[in-house]
Amino acid sequence: MYKQIEIFTDGSCLGNPGPGGCAGILRYRQYKKEFSAGYHITTNNRMELMAAIIALESLKNSCQIILYSDSQYLLTGITQWIQIWKKHHWKTADSKLVKNIDLWRRLDIAIQPHNIKDWRWLKSHTGHPDNERCDQLARKAAKYPLNKDFDNNPVVLYNDNDLMKID
């Protein structure tokens, strides 16, 4: 039986491109795990993708997942475009390579062990506590980026010792 995990993600960028941050919250029953990471030069779309990737890659076992995001780019890409891109060798309709192909491939790999029950859109800045918290963490990470390049090695800026470990 899969553990049922809810994931909330957000990305932020101060300029596009510019310093950026990503953040997420993973919920399992009464437990919660938060993360954030900042990068010196990136884009808002890369941060939205990285938030989902970091969350999914942090899970040690296969889980049933509902992922919430305010990013239409992430949600439309993963639910509609990705299968077409893969079928066409990661190229768009005009035969150009998909933007952020490195992260789309990484996200595609990250979802494989899991049962993704749903990808859900949340309108941003409407008061949903987990979405607002992710936004706050992502913006803070963008203000204090610790990675010189987008090197896929996030530095955790926030980690509550009382939070759960999802095994």
Curated annotation (Swiss-Prot):
It catalyses: Endonucleolytic cleavage to 5'-phosphomonoester. Its main location: cytoplasm. Mg(2+) 2 binds at residues 10, 135. Its cofactor is Mg(2+). The keyword Magnesium applies. Its EC number is 3.1.26.4. It comes from the Bacteria. The keyword Transmembrane helix does not apply. Binds 1 Mg(2+) ion per subunit. May bind a second metal ion at a regulatory site, or after substrate binding. HAMAP family: RNase_H. Endonuclease that specifically degrades the RNA of RNA-DNA hybrids. This is Ribonuclease H. It comes from Blochmanniella floridana.
